[in-house]
């Protein structure tokens, strides 16, 4: 039963850009809002402010007063309260009335005219925007005072009176990488706590949230530009890992999709195909690849993504309850244990509680005692739960991952992952798995894979992950970039000393107390913040800013170069199309030539295959014989029929008739077998009768001139036919024949 059409749960998707939903909304447009300021000594009795204060107090009261954060260390999860001072985090009674908000002399109202910080201080001139002409009567973004989200107790001591042009020039003079600077960093609760620490120790409560975000954006911008000049070793490491996986696959096989091909396969279904609704996602912790549908990934994050095992207990050794494998895609059970997704899909007692998120795995208690006692014939380990060969009279047991590593036949048919996860599927779509002895015809032998798997488990304790050796060689080179450590082993950036100097200049620009130790601590905090995110950037890419620093000549040069490259690509596309057509024609010619030589070499074999064997193999009688016949000698004859291993029609007739005679006299033969045998014998006899007396060589000689390997088409077949019929060319008539011919003509 397919549950997909009846379930209205969340669907697999990717992150969308906000302009997909609001195409007219500009990212630089400021949306005005007003918040109450903190309470001062003087109390206001204005009714409007009372209403605002009461409303905000009610809203704050509905939220939990104490928030906690989870800390995960060595697999243990602990909680820690996240508490700030009450008078610093809660909005309190506002002393400014609504009518006084337009005042220009109020010390709490800071008018930001035009600033280089477009995110917080720059007010868009909405009168120039067509989509906002209707709103100019209600709100004037140029004349109205503007409040930021964060307001301090006292009057702000930062008043930006510098014009936008001079401010941008000032930032560009601090560092050439800060041209067209725009703050893009967003603070979180952790940053809020660290900002309180900085203000208390270094900046005397002068650093605001906006300045802190500017400093963090500055560090991200500087690192973005410096990282472009650092030699990358990721490609070498990735290449080494691919070669290592391929080598391990050749030696020991694979149960998680690594090493099968250059394109890593899904660890659950071993598929490499993907689309926009079901893409393959790689874990940034263990580099495992899984489909969204196979692992239950509803939403693909913008940054790094970790599988469940790396997220919860990356440093601990995960052991599957159902098999001895330690690699692959894991999910937790309802009791906290680990089980492979593929094990849960193939064991009939297990199922997924949530089919969209594919977790938790339930039904472990339903696994029968007899299944726990089965011994895997591949790894020889007495652990976990095994499945058995689907052949009716075969009881061979093996683990799911052992079968995957050995390359046994495992097919889910037309069942979907959702149906397998819920154990709700039709009987005609049932899954199948066979041992190496009962694999379907055409499936490659698994003997070599079984030997690889046994070798892997016998050497499991001594296997160690290879480490690339090129890093040490790179560190010993004379490159100036390798003399300085730019990243930690965890790919965390290390801020150089120049970053602290740039931060000091930025802080001086705002006129704050500027101890050098404060800039160094901010750089350390930024590095730890990047380490927390696995080395991923804290802001969006700065490519637009870097392109904005180019001159018109440089931009035009890049455009011309791109156009030249585009023309070359078009030419290359045409050449590849022609090469493809030539290759297809050459392959077709080779196939036709091979077919012609096969016909000339063994004409009766070709005649037998086309007119008898192809028809007989596709018949229901032949398929029934494959199922019912168990004698090895008789099965050999059926295999010869499938591969057309008969040189002449007479040889085939003798062997197939002997086959039917043995079946008729076979002791203990069932009635069904005898009936099928008689029908098949009748069919083969009729087919042989159609070609038994056909001289294929004689027919070929009429149309072709065959001399060893040289074959030419005969221009006219008349002489050959005359020779076959004993005819000769036209001769002169005698006198008697002339008189007889005239007599016949006159009498007519």
From Swiss-Prot:
GO terms for molecular function: methylated histone binding; zinc ion binding. Keywords: Cytoplasm, Metal-binding, Nucleus, Phosphoprotein, Repeat, Transcription, Transcription regulation, Zinc, Zinc-finger. GO terms for biological process: chromatin remodeling; DNA-templated transcription; regulation of transcription by RNA polymerase II. It is found in: Cytoplasm; Nucleus. One of its GO terms (cellular component) is cytoplasm. SUPFAM superfamilies: FYVE/PHD zinc finger. The modification Phosphoserine is found at residue 728. A zinc finger (PHD-type) spans 263-313, 374-439. A zinc finger (C2HC pre-PHD-type) spans 317-350. SMART domains: PHD. Present with 172 molecules/cell in log phase SD medium. Component of the NuA3 histone acetyltransferase complex. The NuA3 HAT complex has 2 functionally distinct forms. NuA3a binds H3K4me3, through the PHD finger of YNG1, and acetylates H3K14 at the promoter region of actively transcribed genes to promote transcription initiation. NuA3b binds H3K36me3 at the coding regions of actively transcribed genes, through the PWWP domain of PDP3, and coordinates transcription elongation. Residues 156 to 543 compose a region conserved in chromatin associated proteins. Component of the NuA3 histone acetyltransferase (HAT) complex. The NuA3 HAT complex has 2 functionally distinct forms that participate in transcription. The NuA3a HAT complex is composed of at least NTO1, SAS3, TAF14, YNG1 and EAF6. The NuA3b HAT complex contains an additional subunit, PDP3. This is NuA3 HAT complex component NTO1. The lineage of its organism: Eukaryota, Fungi, Dikarya, Ascomycota, Saccharomycotina. The gene is NTO1.
């Amino acid at each position: 039963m397919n549950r997909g059409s009846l379930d209205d749960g969340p669907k697999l998707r990717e992150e969308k850009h906000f302009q997909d939903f609001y195409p007219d909304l500009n990212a630089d447009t400021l949306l005005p809002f007003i918040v109450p300021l903190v309470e001062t000594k003087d109390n206001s009795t204005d009714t409007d402010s009372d209403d605002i204060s009461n409303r905000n107090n009610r809203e704050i009261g509905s939220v939990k007063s104490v928030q906690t954060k989870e800390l995960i260390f060595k697999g243990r999860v602990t909680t820690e309260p996240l508490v700030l001072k009450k008078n610093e985090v809660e909005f309190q009674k506002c002393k400014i009335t609504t009518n006084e908000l337009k005042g220009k002399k109020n010390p709490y109202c800071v008018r930001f005219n035009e600033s280089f910080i477009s995110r917080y201080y720059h007010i868009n001139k909405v009168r120039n925007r067509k989509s906002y002409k209707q709103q100019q009567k209600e709100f004037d973004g140029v004349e109205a005072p503007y409040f930021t989200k964060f307001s301090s107790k006292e009057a702000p001591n930062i008043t930006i009176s510098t014009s936008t042009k001079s401010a941008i020039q000032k930032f560009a003079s601090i560092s050439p990488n800060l041209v067209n600077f725009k703050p893009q960093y967003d603070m979180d609760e952790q940053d809020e706590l660290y900002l309180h620490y900085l203000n208390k120790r270094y900046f005397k409560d002068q650093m605001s949230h906006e300045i802190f975000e500017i400093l963090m954006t500055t560090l991200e911008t500087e690192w973005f530009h410096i990282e472009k000049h650092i030699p990358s070793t990721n490609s070498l490491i990735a290449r080494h890992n691919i070669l290592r996986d391929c080598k391990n696959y050749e030696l020991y096989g694979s149960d998680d999709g690594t090493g099968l091909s250059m394109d890593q396969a899904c660890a659950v279904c071993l598929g490499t195909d993907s689309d926009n609704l079901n893409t393959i996602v790689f874990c940034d912790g263990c580099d495992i690849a899984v489909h969204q549908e196979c692992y239950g990934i509803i939403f693909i994050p913008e940054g790094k993504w970790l599988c469940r095992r790396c997220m919860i207990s990356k440093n601990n050794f995960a052991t599957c309850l159902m098999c001895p494998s330690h690699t692959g895609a894991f999910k937790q059970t309802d009791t906290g244990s680990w089980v492979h997704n593929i094990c849960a899909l193939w064991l009939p007692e297990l199922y997924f509680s949530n089919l969209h998120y594919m977790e938790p795995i339930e039904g472990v208690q339903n696994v029968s005692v007899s299944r726990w006692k089965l011994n895997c014939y591949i790894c020889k380990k007495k652990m976990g739960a095994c499945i058995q060969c689907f052949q009716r009279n075969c009881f061979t047991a093996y683990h799911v991952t052992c079968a995957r590593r050995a390359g046994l036949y495992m097919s889910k048919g037309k069942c979907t992952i959702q149906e397998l996860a819920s154990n709700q599927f039709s009987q005609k779509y049932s899954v199948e798995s066979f041992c190496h002895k009962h694999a379907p015809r055409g499936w490659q032998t698994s003997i070599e894979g079984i030997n690889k798997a046994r070798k892997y488990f016998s050497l499991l304790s001594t296997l160690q992950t290879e480490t690339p050796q090129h890093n040490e060689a790179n560190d010993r080179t004379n490159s100036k970039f390798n003399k300085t450590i730019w990243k930690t082993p965890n790919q965390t950036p290390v801020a150089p000393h120049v970053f602290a100097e740039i931060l000091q200049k930025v802080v001086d620009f705002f006129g704050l107390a500027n101890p050098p130790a404060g800039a160094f601590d901010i750089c350390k905090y930024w590095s730890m913040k990047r380490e927390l995110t696995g080395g991923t950037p804290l802001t969006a890419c700065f490519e637009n800013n870097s392109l904005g620093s180019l001159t018109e000549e440089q931009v035009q040069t890049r455009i011309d170069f791109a156009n030249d490259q585009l023309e070359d690509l078009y030419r290359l596309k045409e050449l590849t199309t022609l090469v493809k057509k030539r290759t297809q024609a050459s392959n077709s010619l080779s196939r036709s030539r091979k077919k012609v030589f096969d016909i000339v070499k063994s004409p009766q074999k070709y005649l037998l295959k086309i007119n008898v064997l192809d028809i007989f193999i596709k018949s229901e009688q032949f398929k029934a014989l494959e199922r019912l016949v168990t004698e090895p000698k008789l099965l050999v004859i059926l295999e010869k029929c499938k591969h057309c291993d008969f040189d002449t029609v007479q040889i085939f007739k003798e062997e197939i008739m002997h086959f039917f005679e043995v079946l008729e006299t076979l002791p203990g033969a069932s009635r069904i077998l005898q009936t099928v045998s008689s029908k098949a014998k009748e069919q083969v006899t009729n087919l042989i009768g159609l070609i038994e007396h056909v001289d294929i060589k004689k027919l070929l000689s009429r149309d072709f001139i065959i001399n060893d390997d040289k074959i030419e088409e005969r221009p006219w077949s008349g002489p050959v036919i005359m020779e076959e019929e004993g005819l000769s060319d036209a001769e002169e008539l005698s006198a008697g024949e002339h008189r007889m011919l005239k007599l016949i003509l006159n009498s007519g």
